[in-house]
Design a protein with these regions (language model features):
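Catalytic cores of nucleotide-sugar-dependent glycosyltransferases that transfer UDP/GDP/TDP-activated
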Residues: 1-238
Length: 238
């Protein structure tokens, strides 16, 4: 409630986001430009208390917000959903923004100063770091594929928290959800025939809403990339 939504568009560089694919070879360039635009926007609006960003894509943002000439310094929260994607790029690319040399050094790799990592700098420059569960937080702490990323996370471990991710079961409650044709609750686990009858009616209502021909093949829904990490093979096995 009472939240304002702002859309940041880079009209002067619209070609950066006019790619035929969601992901491409110039992702770091695109998100460097977006980070710079976001930093300029945040400095131009009335002071905010907290800036919360997600994954490596805006990893440059905290470094830009902590520039010595910044009008104020909001607290910054960095949430990592996927520790495997980190935003490796050239240091030259980041140096073309308004980031100062001190904060730029947080992004550079010690083993190769010409290479920087969006996630690495984001870890060092943020005030708090979160991820999607306590278990995943522990997995991240035990991940050594890049020792410098591991060192960055270990250094910030005192402000690193795993917070269990999930839906709000008060809103998305099958017992009360107004979007369902047939409501049900866990008590129907003891009455499987009635449960499957209700689920069948919900499936039919969904197919009708989507303009699909109803059939008796399994219906599964997942909002995800279809990659090995997500385990799509389990759907087939099910």
């Amino acid at each position: 409630e009472n939240l304002a939504l702002s859309v940041i568009k880079l009209d002067s560089q619209i070609e950066l986001f006019s790619t035929p694919k969601i992901y491409s070879h110039d992702d770091t360039m695109r998100f460097t430009a977006l980070s710079a635009a976001c930093a300029a926007y945040i400095h131009d609006i009335p002071p905010v208390d907290i800036v919360h960003f997600h994954d490596w894509h805006l990893g440059l943002l905290p470094g830009l917000l902590k520039h010595p000439d910044s009008p104020y310094y909001p607290k910054i929260v960095f949430t990592i959903h996927n520790f495997c994607y980190r935003g490796y790029c050239s240091t030259k690319l980041l140096s073309e923004t308004k980031i100062d040399n001190f904060h730029l050094s947080n992004y550079q790799l010690f083993r190769d100063p010409q290479t920087s990592v969006m996630m690495k700098g984001g870890l060092y420059c943020s005030d708090a770091i979160t991820t999607v569960s306590p278990t995943y937080a522990q997995e991240m702490m035990n991940e050594y594929s890049d020792p410098e990323i591991h060192d960055a996370l270990s250094t910030r471990s005192s402000v690193f928290f795993g917070i269990l991710n999930g839906i709000d079961d008060r809103t998305w409650n099958p017992e009360t959800d107004p979007h369902l044709a047939e409501n049900y609750d866990k008590s129907l686990l003891r009455e499987p025939d009635l449960l499957f009858m209700k689920k069948e009616k919900n499936k039919a209502a969904l197919y009708e809403r989507l303009g699909l021909e109803l059939n008796y093949s399994p219906l599964m829904c997942i909002i995800s990339r279809i990659v090995e990490q997500k385990g799509p093979e389990f759907m087939k096995e099910a």
